[in-house]
Amino acid sequence: MAEGEELLPLSTSGGDSWEKDLEEALEAGGCDLETLRNIIQGRPLPAELRAKVWKIALNVAGKGDSLASWDGILDLPEQNTIHKDCLEFIEQLSVPEEKAAELLLDIESVITFYCKSRSVKYSTSLSWIHLLKPLICLQLPRSDLYNCFYAVMNKYIPRDCSLKGRPFHLFRLLIQYHEPELCSFLDTKKITPDSYALNWLGSLFAHYCSTEVTQAIWDGYLQQADPFFIYFLMLIILVNTKEVILAQESDSKEEVIRFLESTPASLNLEDIEDLFSLAQYYCSKTPASFRKDNHHLFGSTLLGIKDDEADLSQALCLAVSVSEILQANQLQGEGVRFFVVDCRPAEQYNAGHLATAFHLDSDLMLQNPSEFAQSVKSLLEAQKQSIESGSIAGGEHLCFMGSGREEEDMYMNMVLAHFLQKNKEYVSIASGGFMALQQHLADINVEGPESGYGHWIASTSGSRGSISSVDGESCNGSNDRGMKSLVSKMTVALKTKSVTVREKVISFIENSSTPVDRHVSSSDRVGKPYRGVKPVFSIGDEEEYDTDEIDSSSMSDDDRKEVVNIQTWINKPDIKHHFPCKEVKESGHMFPSHLLVTATHMYCLREILSRKGLAYIQSRQALNSVVKITSKKKHPELITFKYGNSSASGIEILAIERYLIPNAGDATRAIKQQIMKVLDALES
């Protein structure tokens, strides 16, 4: 997540006018989370309005009584344990005697019905009692209490939240990515995250923090509406106590665990603003694959987790998808950028490689340790210089790429371990290696190198005929040729055993140019024609419409003029999906764009090529207005969206938009699923 409008400082300034606005918005009804966020802007919530805000944030406002159909019988095998835990909890709350019995029945009923409806066995270790504490303080009726509890469990408590569970293996990888020294210290003591953070995650800090602090954390967390954000809050708690933890080298494992487990208890209300600001910063420095590859941990899903993906306990480090690697280094300004290190043998690298990748032959680690050490030194210097010079190959984040074949990547894993032992932060591995890169480029390739994707692969051996050796001299401008020349020189330099290898590599990086604007005349500004397709697009056998006329009338002048920061919009908490694409006009011209999907709308941001990192809001369409999504057999990546109204008399088309979307199948599937959710919500 990036800084900006998605999470503003938790300040108390601004008088009480915003509180009146919030109260009026809540009283008016029909208020959504985005409206609330715009009013609240990260400020502490008034206690009397918290219940209404949380219900909207949890999407249970106006929801019916889920317990209405239940007979109310408390007869689970573990009922005595449930009753005992609830009774102890009520005693801790110091509830007036006349209300205690009713509250006890509410809590016991909520837990019992949840267990019955979800076929879950209760145990004290689950932290459910603590999770209910901040909700009980809202003094909700039983039906709302259950709905809120269910929503929190469903959206914010990850699957397998148990000892040795997958969520904690993932947390260890996040710690290692940002704080390798701390991770190494805990690993040495054989302290795993589940041993101290089980109740952090299982209760969303309610187990250890005071009610006031817990409510303040939940105020921000529920408005953030990002279940993964809890990982960064947990990370900051560790980071803030890092020096104390590292000083406990002589303490026993049990003593360190006890200290770690209780650290959230020291939080007070004044700490919350800094906690969220720091979490936001670390969040912005984390690859998007951290979320995307583990999205199934949260929410309702019928999809199983593949065995080979599930064992994060065996992962060397955080994995990053090849699609993110390609997209990240096209970003301008803020955001995660990767310095890709290709660890395959020289002959494989020469046959074909990612054009921006630095070659580090992992075989050297055993065959020639001194040359390997020199190459590593050169690599780190080259990374530094590439960042300073603004090279498109530059990035703070080291991503190692192997072949994708386990037996061949053994040496690369040793290289990875070497960097991790040196406590190098921001170390990741490319998921699936070069094989996955080849497959991804094949999937998004439209019509060979001329489509604009061929420039991603470079070759230093002159071989041709497969995607691993796509012609490097595609017509992508002088800076692409310069990039390939740079990679070739780096490869030759790294093969040289001369002591001057470091200086050579650095000079090559320094002499590389940053991407330049390709507009050379006013005629170029209308976009690049989509090759191989006639100016008038027909999708399958669909009827044609005068889309230029529709396009020009489908948005206001104000919309067309609004300029936004692309990365800020992509990282908004309500953005569920982001698809880099090209908007295709009837003239055949294409414009680099981004499709962003929220719970209810789809936005098209068209890049402003003369203002890097900025875009116009080209269109904003309600998902429930999509009446048809079609593609062409010869060009399945070319997707047409038709918007309008459906009625008994037929479909009235009001707007048509066409996009060239890499991995179009994934994009349309995600959009269709979101449309169905909108329609289901409207029907209910």
Swiss-Prot record:
Task: Tell me any Pfam family this protein matches.
Answer: Rhodanese
Among SMART domains, the record links this protein to: TBC
Quote the InterPro entries the UniProt record gives: Rab-GAP-TBC_dom, Rab-GAP_TBC_sf, Rhodanese-like_dom, Rhodanese-like_dom_sf, TBC1D23, TBC1D23_C
> Any keyword Phosphoprotein?
yes
Q: Which residues carry this modification: Phosphoserine?
A: 300, 469, 474, 507, 556
Positions carrying Phosphothreonine are: 514
Phenotype on deletion? Mutant mice exhibit increased inflammatory cytokine production and recruit more inflammatory cells to the peritoneum, when challenged with different pathogen-associated molecular patterns (PAMPs), including LPS.
Look up keyword GTP-binding and say if it applies: no
Q: Which residues form the Rhodanese domain?
A: 334-446
> Could you tell me the keywords of this UniProt record?
Cytoplasmic vesicle, Developmental protein, Golgi apparatus, Phosphoprotein
Q: A single GO CC term, please?
A: trans-Golgi network
- Enumerate the residue ranges of region (May mediate the interaction with C17orf75, FAM91A1 and WDR11): 514-558
What interactions and quaternary structure are annotated? Answer: Directly interacts with GOLGA1 and GOLGA4. Interacts with FAM91A1, C17ORF75 and WDR11; the interaction recruits TBC1D23 to AP-1-derived vesicles. Directly interacts with WASHC1 and WASHC2/FAM21. Interacts with FKBP15.
Stated role: Putative Rab GTPase-activating protein which plays a role in vesicular trafficking. Involved in endosome-to-Golgi trafficking. Acts as a bridging protein by binding simultaneously to golgins, including GOLGA1 and GOLGA4, located at the trans-Golgi, and to the WASH complex, located on endosome-derived vesicles. Together with WDR11 complex facilitates the golgin-mediated capture of vesicles generated using AP-1. Plays a role in brain development, including in cortical neuron positioning.
Q: Under which name does UniProt file this protein? A: TBC1 domain family member 23
Query: Which gene is transcribed and translated to give this protein?
Result: Tbc1d23
